[in-house]
Amino acid sequence: MMRNNNLKRREPLTDTQLLLTITICIFFAMYGLAMLVWGGGFLRFQQVFDMLNNNAALIIVACGLTIVMIGGGIDISVGGVTALVVMSCIVHMNNGGSIFTAALLAIGIGLCFGLVHGFLISYLEIQPFIITLAGMFFARGMTTIVSLEPQKIAHEGFQQLMKTKIEIPWLGYIAKKGNLIPARMEIGVVVALVVLVVVFIMLKKTRLGRGFYAIGGNSQSALMLGVNVKRTRFFSYLISGLLSGIAGFVFMMHTGAGNATNAAGAEMNAIASAIIGGTLLSGGVGNVIGTFFGVLTLTTIKAIVTTSGLREPWWQSITTGAMLCFFILLQSVVLSRRAKKKAKAKDLLKE
């Protein structure tokens, strides 16, 4: 009896943890199904690394957007800012600029957009959708002004950086000729993973991170608890802009070229990844680890569609839209049932 009393009661999962668990389970279920049905590349670790290599910039953008969405906002300028950074940095380096100054330029452009968006939304209280939509159009227009023609990086040092790969032999595979092909990961993936860890720690351990959840859950309650709502919201957009700038630099490291349509649809893919990862559009609930698995889930869906023989781009859009609706409905049902159980438990305690 004493032993039972001493046992700690297991605390129920929070909404964020519950949705994260669901996302991870669905990702592994989908990837496992792909391995069983199609085999081939899905059986190799390189498939996962390719997913990361191709989506490192999206992971970074989605991390910034997750912060904004947790705070109850939205930022649809991220794709345009990423494209502007890519084109600006390529033109800068092709005209004698260094890699270091290009990196500073990328960060500076991202911070400028984040600063303007954050100020207008937080302190002038203009609707986030309107401001970031204007920011998206402005960034896309500026991208065209920077260069009407597609650009390719001619900087030798940056070309060498692009070719640099991190090889992991023990995760490789044996080719038909019997030689070992190591798994290869680009530098951009390392940057994306570092950003992911830093943002995760910030949201989990810092006062600012907890403030994002507070203002997203209920801004009035957060204000009464002493949270500076305007400043916290301002920082959410500032960080989103910063990460969009970093994402542009990583995108450039992956493609080595730029044009006016770079990162087209990145904002929609980032929003979809965040929602699939368990971030609520209403705010207050979300996690960048969930967003990371949201990106992987979205990429797996597209890979499955392509492997199935449906190579036309609209099939990927249709499937992505259907899966997004499924995840939104799933979140709604799970959280609704959870709320009813909590209400029922409170009623029983009152009795």
Pin down the residues of each PLM region.
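Transmembrane helix-bundle core of multi-pass membrane transporters
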Residues: 10, 128-205, 232-235, 255-260, ...
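Helix-loop-helix "hairpin" substructures at the membrane interface of multi-pass membrane proteins
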Residues: 98-103, 112-117, 121, 169-258
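Single transmembrane alpha-helix segments in multi-pass membrane proteins
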Residues: 29-36, 44-95, 120-125, 274, ...
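Hydrophobic alpha-helical transmembrane segments
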Residues: 17-25, 51, 59, 80-81, ...
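Structural signal for alpha-helical transmembrane segments and their membrane-water exit/capping regions
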Residues: 26-43, 71, 143-147, 200-207
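Alpha-helical transmembrane segments within multi-pass membrane transporters and channels
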Residues: 97-137, 293-294
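Transmembrane alpha-helical segments in multi-pass inner-membrane proteins
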Residues: 238, 244, 254-321
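Cytosolic-side transmembrane-helix boundaries in multi-pass membrane proteins
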Residues: 1-28, 32-33, 217-220, 224-231, ...
